Every structure is written in C-alpha cells, then in structure tokens.
Amino acid sequence: MVLEFNPVGHEYRADGVKIPSVTQIVSAIYGAFPSIDPEPADRGTYIHELCFEYLRTGSYTTDDIECLRYLQAFMKWVCEREILLPAPELIGKRILYRGYAGTPDIVGDSTIIDIKTGIEQPQRDHMQLIGYQAGNKKILTENLYLRPNGTYEIKRRKYNKQLWRIFQAQAMILNHTRRY
C-alpha cells in the first residue's frame, strides 16, 4: 500500500484514497483548537523543524532568540537521553494503520515521542499518542514539552484500552462519513 502526504491541507492518501489523519481524529473527538493564533502555531512548526534539523545533522541554523530557547530545551533532552548525533533515523516516519495515518515526531526502538511547544492539553495530547501507538501496548509513548525558558518536561503516557477504542471508533466514523 502506498501512503502519500500533502502538507497543504494536511492530507493523507492510501493508494490514492483520502484517509483521516491522527490530528483530524483527535480534533473530531475533542473539537478543533479554539481560534489558533497563527504566530504560536508557526513558531511551533519552526521549532519542530529546528529539532529535526538538529537530529538530522547535529547542528542548527537560527538567529531567532525565542525559538532558540525551545531548541536549547530539546538539546538538553537529547544530551540527557545520550542520543548520538546525527540521528536522522529517529525522525518520525509516516504510519498507516487500519484506515488512518499520521507522522509521529520521534520514533525510537520502543518509544514514540511527540514534541509540544504550546499549552499542555493532557487528554488531547494523550489521545494523539494513542493514535500513533495503534493498539501496540509494548510501545511506550511520551510527550516532550519544550518550554520557552530552555527547560523541558516529559509526560509518559500509558496505554489505555478505552482511549484506543474511542480513537478507533472515531476513525471509523470519519472514514464512513468522509468528513475530514
């Protein structure tokens, strides 16, 4: 099966058929983000790109002081995890699972990590990781919250069978109605 991703519109296709993303499923469960301010959203995207650049090359290029503080938090996390750079293999790859797709930020041997730069939303953040976990209880999941003061916080999320069932049900509804 061929999985394609179009960043314009955040659209996934499996063998040419449009399917919902993890983000769309989570938004259908918890509602859309209340009027997302484009500035923090763009900053979060840029910080993610810097983190991926750092994993890919072991270096970064930015003169944005505000974003650099978030990147410093990420660099501390990399150092404390003793990750040898460059480590492009850790950058998340697209997943396709029974009618939905997504791209986790970081995928290790047994852990999926999702980087967050905004306000912590525990239920929503956990549900997103449940989608990436795809029912595999052996995979550990963590949210890595990067803070603007150069610190970070890890929240480990446990597998939750009920949340997995809710996620699957919403994926089926979206696939049936094609409203995504």
Language-model segment annotations:
Residues M1-A101:
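Metal-dependent nuclease catalytic cores that hydrolyze phosphodiester bonds in DNA/RNA
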Residues K93-Y180:
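Nucleic-acid nuclease catalytic cores
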